Amino acid sequence: MKNELNSKLIISIKEALPPQIKVATYLMDLLSLGREAVYRRIRGDVSFDLKELSVISKALNISIDDVLGKNDTTALFSIDMIQEESFFEQYCNSLIFYTDIFSRMKVHPSSQVQGANNELPFSFYLSHEKIAKFYLYKWVYQLQTSKPTVPFSEFYLPQRVIDLNKKYISESNSCCHTTSILSQNVLSSFLNTVKYFYKLNLLNDQDIEDIKNELLCMLERLESMSISGVWMDDFEFNFYISNIDFDTTYSYMQCPEFELSTIRVFSINVVRSFTPEICQANKKWIESLKRYSTLISKSGDLYRTEFFNNQRKIVRDVLLD
């Protein structure tokens, strides 16, 4: 089956290219791969990953659905598994992939993103420098078990990471209608992690103060968007607070070009699929979680006010106001 799908893709690429251009040469330039790496993919020894499929699809206007076949029962997944030895490089590649996804979605007014989150979504915190840095610091701490841990204040992000974070925020904020279901204990879980690192003497008092202030700023922005029901650039924002906890984070992205489903695994890693059946199942699951949740955008004024006041109190109490 894998070789059959690979053959369909190669045939589609050949049909899309002028006769004088060789497939191998074109793919080497397009994907920035060496000759042998390209030939392994052409022969079917190695599968094209979803990022490569996305690049090929965009460059040659090839429909991946057509390549796979609408009636094909095979579900394709890609795992963004970030390893210790190339942590920042792989993190950057993941940001580039999703930034490109948002860039493609924003040209379609009907585009939408739905998510059920058991931790703070990227789009909520990535614009806050210390919070974004802490998430990466925590992941590096967890992955690099064989190396000494530097204090948070001495942990520096590469400039490329900072730049790509900003680009991700820019594209995701100007993209599409958003529905977010947030587990009610998300912030408490994050704060407990921050407090743990403080007890390890890896965070100092100033770090705690900075993170606290950014969290309060984030809550103020979320409350404002919840009241208006508007996400950033005048897109609809449906915000739910769940009364139960989720086992992981699920998201569903949709526009006329494609559907994309993602499931968070092992904290930082993501399993993603463009397979329509998987996407629809994920969408249905996310929507089913609304049964356990309370809509607080443009409604539920009392519940919303109590929720945000309680979150601010938790932040101040845990982080030693």
Where are these regions (language model features)?
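Charged, low-complexity, helix/coiled-coil-prone segments
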Residues: M1-L5, S32-Y39, Y125-K133, P148-L164
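Basic, Lys/Arg-rich alpha-helical nucleic-acid-recognition elements, primarily the DNA-binding modules
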Residues: M1-M81
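Generic detection of long, well-ordered alpha-helical segments
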Residues: N3, L17, F88, D205-K212
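Exposed alpha-helical structural elements
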Residues: K8, S12, Y26, A37, ...
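Residues that form generic nucleotide/phosphate-binding pockets
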Residues: S12, A16, L30, I101, ...
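Helix-turn-helix/homeodomain-like alpha-helical modules used for DNA recognition
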Residues: T73-V150
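Hydrophobic protein-protein interaction segments
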Residues: Y137-Q311
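Long, charge-rich alpha-helical interaction segments
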Residues: I314-D321
